[in-house]
Amino acid sequence: MNNIEQAISFARQEYTRQGLDALYQKDFEEALLPALSQAAEIYRADTLRWSGDPKTDLLAALLWSQKLLNDYQRHQLPDEVFYHTIDDIGRWASEYWSYSGKIGLAESAWLTNHLTLRLFQLGRLQFCMEPADFSAPSFGLEPGEPLVSVHICRGGSLDPAACDASFARARAFFPKHFPAYAFRFFSCHSWLLDETLLPLVGVYSNISFFQQRFQIVGRTASNAAARYVLRWDIQPDEIAAFIPQNRFQSQLKTQLLSQQQFYEATGILAR
């Protein structure tokens, strides 16, 4: 079996392991034709490139997972971290399916971090090595300083104990596996750090406890809360007709219809 055949075989296995066969009710070949005709070209490329076609990009993510596994093995990174990290492919494929009814990926650029050995899922949270794109003068932090950014993938609550365990793993993981990557801070840029949410979720909620981990150093107006809580592709003129499925959605819808502004906030946490 040559390298391309191995990559296609691995992609097929991941397609099934991540539940895409059940989601689409189609096997690997049926779901990804005609994109499969480009498999060799995608796999042989020196760098990961996204085509902009959702189906082709899903195939690219699955094929490059096999290259990523080779990188993990060279760096002696745990298999468990590899599989948890690339599970995000299935999450984003499911997200795209939920609002479009189509096979593919719409947020493929985000997965570049996973597939190029920069982002790792360590328990509940994801951690990504990247330079700061903001400043925090009171902390002596300038743009370009190496950080480890924190991301919260869909699936599961923000249980404080689970988050504690993730941070503990990250504090051990990066010095062990990437000792040359010196960083002083974790950072997080998220709608979940928006204090405007507190009247909706309460001060004793998991979201509130997560916010309290960070020193907030900035915020920008954003519709991210509507996208993550209501529907990923929702437009402002569609909010009134949206049917809430839970209390949080109902409360957020009410606030959005009253013209409440929500934000994405940036916070930092000392390593």
Range-by-range predicted roles:
Residues 158-175, 186:
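Conserved acetyl-CoA-binding loop-helix of GNAT-fold acetyltransferases
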Residues 188-193:
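An acidic- and aromatic-residue-enriched active-site/binding cleft used to recognize and process polar
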Residues 195-197:
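Solvent-exposed beta-hairpin/edge-strand motifs
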